[in-house]
């Protein structure tokens, strides 16, 4: 399973990328707005930190604008993935991007039917929003399982990128449900390293080692 970081915070990205565990990055207009920086500059800097896919979202809602913005974003770096909303216009743009060899991440997916259309349009990634579905009383993980079954039935190449991840349990459940990737907020990514029994066990080992008076070096 590939793990992407959902952030535009370059300092945080550098820190976590140093672990060698970050396979890519996703961004969105909300994260760009919070950064207070120029979008193209942020995307270019992120692409210089990670070699994997970096999703950058178009702001337009009509096909013409999405195509123009997507082409400009794709020109920033070879690892840019153009992120488009799962709308009729977005899927028309996705088909054109596919024909042009531009990778796409179709976002805001809330149903398996939508995911089917995105795959038929040639999307590189589909982003089902797990946490937001849970907020509305649905089971976000059920959606991943449904998409996985459909994609496997018809040998679609589109990868399932679990989004709107809120907890480390979401990451585990998405992996079990067959997601190819998950995009994770920095705080949740940090939480993946931790378990109270790991810390407790480490402290015990260190205490026992100290009693030996030995040094490995």
From Swiss-Prot:
Locations listed in the record: Cytoplasm
GO biological processes: carbohydrate metabolic process; pentose-phosphate shunt
Enzyme superclass (EC): transferase
SS bonds (residue pairs): none
Annotated active site: 83
GO MF, any single term: aldehyde-lyase activity
Gene Ontology, cellular component aspect: cytoplasm
InterPro entries for the chain: Aldolase_TIM (IPR013785), TAL/FSA (IPR001585), Transaldolase_3B (IPR022999), Transaldolase_3B/F6P_aldolase (IPR004731), Transaldolase_AS (IPR018225), TSA/FSA_arc/bac (IPR033919)
Metabolic or biological pathway: Carbohydrate degradation; pentose phosphate pathway; D-glyceraldehyde 3-phosphate and beta-D-fructose 6-phosphate from D-ribose 5-phosphate and D-xylulose 5-phosphate (non-oxidative stage): step 2/3
SUPFAM superfamilies listed in its UniProt record: Aldolase
EC number from the UniProt entry: 2.2.1.2
Catalysed reactions, semicolon-separated: D-sedoheptulose 7-phosphate + D-glyceraldehyde 3-phosphate = D-erythrose 4-phosphate + beta-D-fructose 6-phosphate
Entry keywords, A to Z: Cytoplasm, Pentose shunt, Schiff base, Transferase
Similarity-based family: Belongs to the transaldolase family. Type 3B subfamily.
NCBIfam families to which the protein is assigned, alphabetical: fsa_talC_mipB
Function, in words: Transaldolase is important for the balance of metabolites in the pentose-phosphate pathway.
Protein name stated in the entry: Probable transaldolase
Organism: Phenylobacterium zucineum (strain HLK1)
């Amino acid at each position: 399973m590939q793990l992407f970081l959902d952030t535009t915070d370059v300092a945080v990205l550098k820190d976590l990328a140093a672990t060698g565990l970050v396979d890519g990055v996703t961004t969105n207009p909300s994260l760009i707005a919070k950064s207070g920086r120029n979008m193209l500059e942020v995307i270019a800097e992120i692409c210089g930190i990670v070699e994997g896919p970096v999703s950058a979202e178009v702001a337009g809602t009509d096909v013409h604008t999405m195509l123009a913005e997507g082409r400009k974003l794709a020109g920033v770096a070879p690892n840019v993935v153009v992120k488009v909303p799962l709308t009729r216009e977005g899927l028309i743009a996705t088909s054109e991007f596919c024909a042009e060899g531009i990778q796409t991440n179709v976002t805001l997916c809330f149903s398996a039917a939508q995911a089917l259309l995105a795959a038929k349009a040639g999307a590189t990634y589909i982003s089902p929003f797990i946490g937001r579905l849970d907020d509305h009383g649905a089971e976000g993980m059920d959606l991943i399982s449904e998409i996985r079954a459909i994609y496997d039935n018809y040998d679609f190449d589109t990868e399932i990128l679990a989004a709107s991840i809120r907890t480390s349990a979401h990451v585990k459940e998405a992996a079990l449900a067959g997601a190819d990737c998950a995009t994770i907020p920095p705080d949740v990514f940090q939480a993946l390293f931790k378990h109270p029994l790991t810390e407790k066990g480490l402290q015990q080992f260190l205490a026992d080692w100290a009693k030996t008076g030995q040094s490995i070096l």
